[in-house]
Every structure is written in C-alpha cells, then in structure tokens.
Amino acid sequence: MRYWGKLLGLVLGVMYAPGVVGALLGLLVGHMVDRALGAKRRGFFADQQTRQSLFFRTTFQVMGHLTKAKGRVTEVDIQLASQLMDRMQLHGAARTAAQQAFREGKESHFPLRKALQEFRRVCFGRFDLIRIFLEIQLQAAFADGSLHPNERQVLYVIAEELGISRGQFDQFLRMFDGGRQFGGHGGWQGQQGGYSQSGYQRASQGPTLEDACKVLGVNSSDDSVAIKRAYRKLMGEHHPDKLVAKGLPPEMMEMAKQKAQEIQAAYDLIKREKGFK
C-alpha cells in the first residue's frame, strides 16, 4: 500500500504538533517516505529485461564519459570499446546501440550521477551486478596503461553513487592490479603492466603469490580457511549464469566467465605456494 507513510505521518504529526500545522508536516514527511519506499520497490521488482537493458546502456554511457574525462578519447580507448563489443559479439542494431550510448556518455552535459542512481536503483540488492559494472569501468579507465587524475575523480563518483566506499574502491583497484597478471584483464587491454605507487609498469614476469592474493583480496599470511572463504565468495559473485539471472546482459556472460577463470587461477597458485588443498 502506497499510503502507509502518509497515514503514519499524519498520526505522528497530530500527536507531536496538534492542529493543521502538525497534520500538514506529518503528511509531507509521510509522502517523502512513500516516495522513497516506492523507488526501492520499483528497483527490487524491476523485470530482468529492464535490468539487462539498463545495464547494457549505462555500461557504455559511463564508459564514454570516463574515457572523455581526460580531455580526449584516444585511439586506445576507441580500440578498447571496439574490442569489448567484439567480445560481446555485438553486431547490427545491438552494436549501433552500444556505440550510440558511448557517444551519449561523451557529451559534456551527460548526467552521470543521475544515470548511476537509476542504475543502482534497478540493481537494488544485487551488489554482484554493481561489482561487475565497476570492473568494466576500470577496464576502460586503464585502457591506455595509466590513470589520468580526471579519470580517477570520475571513478570516485561512480563508486560513490553505487554505494561503494573509498576503502572498498581502493581494494577493487588492488584486486584489479593482481588480476592483470593472470591474463583476465590483460586479454582486454593487451600487454599492459601492473600498478605501483609510481604508476603502471610493464610486467616482466608471470603472476606471483602477491598478485594472486590481490585477486582474492587476502593477505599471504592468511590461513587456508580465510583464503577459501574469500575464494568461494568471489566465485559466487562472478558466477555467469547467476549474474545473467539477476540482470547481467547475456552478451556480457563471457566477461564474467573470464573473471571467474582469473579467480580460479589465482586460487590455484595460492594453493600451490602455500601447500594446501
């Protein structure tokens, strides 16, 4: 029922401030509560097709906005977007829609926060979808092997609007860094290097125990119980079929599979190095 907030507000308003003023204030507060709850209900009950469509469009809009943040869209940025569309096997109308969304995001007046708020509302209660979305945007941000200060600021806005704290975002960056050494992200970006405090450097060797721990978000000193728990959690969050059922566009299933393979490879390396099954 959409009027419980107003009714409750009316009763409380009259109780605390008898008369017309109390009733009006109560109705106003109740109306705001009804609107907030209504928005959450619409997000929770959004049908799968609506969620997939919005995920698809917002992904390319925000990607376009992000790549434009540093002042110009480079050839590498365009190649990344094109490669992503190829990987998703986008052709015909679907590819045209993705390209149009990318161009919309590049416009100076693109309402980034509004688009992200709508995306978050439709993904209500589905953090795994939000996580995949952020991982895709990180791919775009690091397409040319470096992170421009303006891109970093846009990423902070993206994280903020998606309900991700600064600490969580920094953790995502570390996990992203480790994953590049396993070929999962590198497959999208070519032979880019890893991240350090001084910037991105070209990798000169294969993945290390430290890289693998970054992927799982654990420390090398953690015991097998903690590592297995982190591994199972990540695999559950990146299960392709579950993600599609929750609203991930089917075209993006391949990316979810690659991420799951990256997590598995990191876990296998940790098991070998630490000697547990």
UniProtKB/Swiss-Prot annotation:
Topology in the lipid bilayer: Single-pass type III membrane protein
Occurrences of domain J (ranges): 211-277
Coiled coil: none
Keyword annotations: Cell inner membrane, Cell membrane, Chaperone, Membrane, Transmembrane, Transmembrane helix
One GO location term (cellular component): plasma membrane
Compartments, record wording: Cell inner membrane
Keyword Ribonucleoprotein: no
Gene Ontology MF: a single term: protein-folding chaperone binding
Annotated TM spans: 7-31
Database matches in PROSITE patterns: DNAJ_2 (PS50076)
InterPro entries found in the cross-reference section: DjlA (IPR023749), DjlA_DnaK_co-chaperone (IPR050817), DjlA_N (IPR007791), DnaJ_domain (IPR001623), J_dom_sf (IPR036869), TerB-like (IPR029024)
Periplasmic side: 1-6
Ranges facing Cytoplasmic side: 32-277
Keyword Cell membrane part of the UniProt annotation: yes
Secretion signal span: none
UniProt comment concerning the protein's domains: The transmembrane domain is a dimerization domain.
Physiological role: Regulatory DnaK co-chaperone. Direct interaction between DnaK and DjlA is needed for the induction of the wcaABCDE operon, involved in the synthesis of a colanic acid polysaccharide capsule, possibly through activation of the RcsB/RcsC phosphotransfer signaling pathway. The colanic acid capsule may help the bacterium survive conditions outside the host.
Summary of subunit composition and partner proteins: Homodimer.
Name of the featured protein: Co-chaperone protein DjlA
Organism: Yersinia pestis
Taxonomy of the source species: Bacteria, Pseudomonadati, Pseudomonadota, Gammaproteobacteria, Enterobacterales
